[in-house]
């Protein structure tokens, strides 16, 4: 019997990591699948759908101004009920730790539909950090039947929690599949590369003779005092290193925009630019000297590009990169951010040690493994 699989995502990071799965399924005749998007990140989500040429079968279009997690949860739960009743899938595929993923898993559970969780088993075991993501992924972990983990450590987390070993599969992370897809496209498609360079050039002129630090920040737990500390640190780094640029694509959330513009707007070597399209960000990341971020996905991507990463969080659910030496936790602490950034700028040995291009998150074949398991099951047996 041909499996009916519903793929659900709603944010830009989810879309990036699920897109390679969708593209592979499009070329297979042994699966009946549909794509549902919630629109949790409307504008940024649509950019990813366009670049990967994905046309959703269902769009809940939930995003409205000033809505909170209660609003998002209610809209997704009610919307998914209608989608599940219409398509009647055998398996619902969700990704990661978003509200879209956790509420979709709950909706599927209510209809006794099997749930497959991509990027399963990540844990900080601090329910409030990151918030609400840690709670989301633990909720999905309880509800899911099939767990696709990116690493051995994430699989071990699930086993320690008492999850059924027969439902746990180590596949690597699909974000590496997406990264390789996009870097190859930029490399081999000259027209596409010219378009990417032209678009970036409208925001920041890359100079191969000048180093730049790439910054991203958007985590809820850093709102308020955390972002003030981050911005103060960036300001001091910029002033102390006038020969190095800081490039910061600023998230659209007002909680990010306000402190960033208040503290960083008029510093000559800090470039506050608009959020970038995925392909533009990948290229900018590949050209950067190092990266300061609170993003989970960048912790997974940057090691493949040989970029040191300073993570502005107290904990990480991706300890493999820390253990590999390519990621260092600095928190939202001004002194830590300044100290570790200056070390990478001044100490070539430290930079070389962190920039070794070893990625513990996979070989770019995670999607292929996931689909084969979904279709055939373990040892070619149906799930």
Swiss-Prot record:
One of its GO terms (molecular function) is UDP-N-acetylglucosamine 2-epimerase activity. Its EC number is 5.1.3.14. It is an enzyme of class 5 (isomerase). It catalyses: UDP-N-acetyl-alpha-D-glucosamine = UDP-N-acetyl-alpha-D-mannosamine. Belongs to the UDP-N-acetylglucosamine 2-epimerase family. NCBIfam families: wecB. This is UDP-N-acetylglucosamine 2-epimerase. The gene is HS11.17.
């Amino acid at each position: 019997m041909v499996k009916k699989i519903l793929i659900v995502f709603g944010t830009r990071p989810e879309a990036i990591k699920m897109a390679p799965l969708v593209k592979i399924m499009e070329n297979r005749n042994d699966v009946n699948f549909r794509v549902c998007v919630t629109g949790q990140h409307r504008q940024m989500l649509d950019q990813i759908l366009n670049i990967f040429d994905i046309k959703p079968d269902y769009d809940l279009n939930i995003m409205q101004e000033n809505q909170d997690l209660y609003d998002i949860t209610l809209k997704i739960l009610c919307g998914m009920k209608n989608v599940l009743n219409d398509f009647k899938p055998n398996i619902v595929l969700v990704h990661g730790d978003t509200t879209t993923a956790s509420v979709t898993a709950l909706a599927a559970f209510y209809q006794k539909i099997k749930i497959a969780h991509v990027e399963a088993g990540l844990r900080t075991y601090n329910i409030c950090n990151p918030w609400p993501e840690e709670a989301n992924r633990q909720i999905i972990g309880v509800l899911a039947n099939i767990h696709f983990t990116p690493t051995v450590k994430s699989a071990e987390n699930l086993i320690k929690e008492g999850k059924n070993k027969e439902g746990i599969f180590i596949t690597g992370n699909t974000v590496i599949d997406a990264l390789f897809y996009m870097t190859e496209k930029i490399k081999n498609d000259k027209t596409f590369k010219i378009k990417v360079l032209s678009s970036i050039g409208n925001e920041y002129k890359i100079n191969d003779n000048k180093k730049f630090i790439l910054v991203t920040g958007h985590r809820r737990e850093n709102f308020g005092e955390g972002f003030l500390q981050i911005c103060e640190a960036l300001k001091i780094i910029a002033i102390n290193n006038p020969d190095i640029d800081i490039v910061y694509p600023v998230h659209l959330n007002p909680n990010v925009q306000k402190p960033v513009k208040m503290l960083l707007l008029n510093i000559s070597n800090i470039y506050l630019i608009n959020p970038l399209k995925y392909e533009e960000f990948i290229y900018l990341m590949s050209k950067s000297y190092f990266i300061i971020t609170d993003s989970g996905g960048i912790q997974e991507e940057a090691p493949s590009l040989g970029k040191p990463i300073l993570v502005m969080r107290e904990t990480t659910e991706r300890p493999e990169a820390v253990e590999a030496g390519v990621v260092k936790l600095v928190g939202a602490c001004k002194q830590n951010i300044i100290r570790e950034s200056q070390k990478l700028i001044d100490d070539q040995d430290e930079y070389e040690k962190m920039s070794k291009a070893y990625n513990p998150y996979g070989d770019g074949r995670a999607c292929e493994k996931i689909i084969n398991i979904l279709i055939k099951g373990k040892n070619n047996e149906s799930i």
